[in-house]
Amino acid sequence: MNKELLLGVNIDHIATIRQARGTRYPDPVQAAMDAEEAGADGITLHMREDLRHIQARDVRLIKQVLQTRMNLELAVTEAMLDFAEEISPEHSCLVPEKREELTTEGGLDILTHRNVVEKAVRRLQLMGSEVSLFIDPDKEQIRAAVDVGAPVIELHTGCYADATSEEKQHYELQRIKEAAEFAASLNLVVNAGHGLHYHNVKPIAAIRELNELNIGHAIIARALFCGLKEAVRHMRQLMQEARLYVND
């Protein structure tokens, strides 16, 4: 029997809409509660250093009201680690960050920044947080994740999602499959996310080694037309359908 694939709903772009006008609405706290009610297994928030969407207040309030769990994405900086220390998130994910990017453009380079990443992992673990590293589907980066003591990785699916041809998409899917298999063989918990939407999620969801998908922009965009709860339910349905037909 195939294990259930979890869905983490990223609600950053609820805050993006709010910050565009500097209003008090729409409220990410309400979005988190609605996503949970619709079946989300967790809520993911990326509090960027430039505070372009999620604010510290959002994180504090959501931490108080969640019935599931919060996954806090953060850059490897003193300011963000200090904030995480205050919040003590159940789950945290270290991600690369550039101020000029529209969205996260690639995975964390553990090989280049090993000492800094290792210290951050240890610090978060001392807070009681389960630490994940957002990395490209690359075996050397996966080995490095093990070396710095992270129990969880999240594979960056952006190249797969952005592929402009079937050949390129197939190539990127194979990279993710092989990376997931390799990581699982090293006893890592393997999650995935970035750029996944309703038309490309099934091949990723069918990868048996994956534990959780983190999806945000596509769900929030669909919610504009059908409501957030229905958007979450539909994504869960597609993921479940993909898992149903994976051979044991």
Swiss-Prot record:
Its EC number is 2.6.99.2. Keywords: Cytoplasm, Pyridoxine biosynthesis, Transferase. It is found in: Cytoplasm. GO terms for biological process: pyridoxine biosynthetic process. Pathway: Cofactor biosynthesis; pyridoxine 5'-phosphate biosynthesis; pyridoxine 5'-phosphate from D-erythrose 4-phosphate: step 5/5. The active site is at 46 (proton acceptor), 73 (proton acceptor), 194 (proton donor). 1-deoxy-D-xylulose 5-phosphate binds at residues 12-13, 48, 53, 103. SUPFAM superfamilies: Pyridoxine 5'-phosphate synthase. Catalyzes the complicated ring closure reaction between the two acyclic compounds 1-deoxy-D-xylulose-5-phosphate (DXP) and 3-amino-2-oxopropyl phosphate (1-amino-acetone-3-phosphate or AAP) to form pyridoxine 5'-phosphate (PNP) and inorganic phosphate. This is Pyridoxine 5'-phosphate synthase. It comes from Legionella pneumophila (strain Lens). The gene is pdxJ.
